């Protein structure tokens, strides 16, 4: 029988009853409350990407534990390599709990989830992961039993099955992300701009839509690499609008940019130390000096803005010099209410952008 709004506390206790833990992963909105519950218990290890999460889990298995990896199905691609060349090869066991975005039975989901949602079951089977849809706490026993004979098994979680668990947030930073984007949009108006997935793209679209804006709604962590590819083919200034969670997911892109040194690239990271679109779960940016990372990766200059006045001045300084340059903008966690969705299809975004660059 399908359980609706399963309590995070009961789910956690059932997992612990069978000896599961530790818990690691990448935040997901489908069961975002469970991540927050684990954070409050200090039982969650945030990973920058899903492959890293599975590797952490594998290491804990080698130390005698029964690890759990939490993720969204969009991140399955990131863990295919450690699943096929580590877990399967070395007979290392892990339980995956996967938020199922784009389930064909949920046709109203966002377009970036449609293909992966349709192929999730087939993809798991293809890489030898037996799966089951989580419908009740009894399915934890199923997972435990199946792990006796399998290296990795997965429980798929549909929206609404696990209850929402709200997080209390506080911040000492002055700006909201929306306020920072208003300043950035004004100073970079008419320039080529690449904006990262989720709320950064939606807010930029609302503040200053432009035919030279390229909004991505998926491909988390790849925006700076996409921008690099364009910057190397154009002479005009290219602006990257990134987020801390996305930047951390594929941090190696900074080293590539620093090595290639495109003079026309300015990389801006709007850092709220959380995953805004999935429930404000913590990233690891609070203990990572991203501005220094960029500088040590070979960026020409790197600055940090904590206030509106600093953002105005430091952004202008970096716009006036050759790059690649990096600007870290610390902002409050949270989202502006009722920000509209991008009304262009992904294909329309591509065609409009390419025509603008001709």
Language model features: what each stretch is:
Residues 8, 144-145, 308-320:
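A short, acidic, amphipathic alpha-helical segment used as a generic capping/interface helix at domain edges
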Residues 94, 250-271:
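A short alpha/beta connector and helix-capping loop motif
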Residues 151-156, 323-329:
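Active-site regions of oxyanion-processing enzymes, predominantly non-cytosolic
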Residues 157, 241-244, 270, 329:
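Active-site flanking residues adjacent to catalytic metal/cofactor-binding acidic residues
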Residues 193, 238-241, 268:
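Residue-level marker for buried hydrophobic side chains located in beta-strands
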């Amino acid at each position: 029988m399908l359980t609706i709004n399963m309590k995070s506390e009961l789910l956690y206790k059932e997992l612990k009853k069978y000896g599961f833990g530790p818990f690691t992963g990448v935040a997901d909105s489908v069961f975002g409350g469970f991540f927050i519950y684990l954070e409050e218990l200090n039982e969650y290890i945030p990973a920058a990407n899903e492959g890293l999460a599975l590797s952490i889990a594998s290491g804990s298995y080698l130390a005698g534990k029964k690890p759990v990896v939490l993720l969204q199905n969009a991140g399955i691609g990131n863990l295919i390599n450690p699943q096929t060349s580590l877990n399967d090869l070395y007979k290392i066991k892990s339980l995956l709990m996967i938020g199922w975005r784009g389930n064909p039975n949920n046709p109203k989901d966002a377009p970036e989830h449609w293909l992966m949602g349709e192929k999730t079951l087939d993809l798991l089977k293809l890489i030898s992961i037996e799966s089951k849809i989580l419908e009740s706490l009894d399915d934890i026993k199923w997972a435990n039993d199946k792990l006796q004979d399998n290296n990795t098994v997965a429980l798929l979680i549909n929206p609404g099955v696990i209850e929402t668990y709200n997080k209390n947030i506080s911040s000492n930073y002055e700006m909201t992300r929306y306020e920072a984007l208003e300043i950035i949009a004004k100073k970079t108006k008419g320039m080529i701009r690449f904006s990262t997935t989720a709320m950064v793209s939606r807010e930029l679209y609302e503040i200053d839509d432009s035919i030279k804006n390229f909004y991505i709604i998926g491909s988390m962590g790849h925006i700076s690499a996409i921008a690099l590819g364009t910057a190397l083919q154009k002479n005009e200034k290219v602006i990257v609008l990134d987020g801390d969670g996305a930047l951390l997911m594929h941090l190696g892109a900074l080293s590539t940019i620093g090595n290639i040194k495109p003079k026309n690239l300015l990389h801006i990271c709007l850092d709220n130390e959380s995953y805004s679109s999935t429930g404000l779960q913590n990233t690891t940016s609070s203990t990572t000096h991203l501005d220094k990372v960029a500088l040590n990766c070979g960026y020409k200059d790197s600055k940090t803005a904590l206030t509106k006045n600093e953002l105005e001045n430091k952004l202008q300084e970096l716009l006036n010099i050759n790059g690649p340059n990096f600007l870290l903008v610390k902002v409050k966690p949270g989202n502006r209410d009722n920000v509209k969705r991008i009304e262009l299809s992904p294909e329309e975004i591509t065609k409009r952008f390419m025509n603008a660059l001709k």
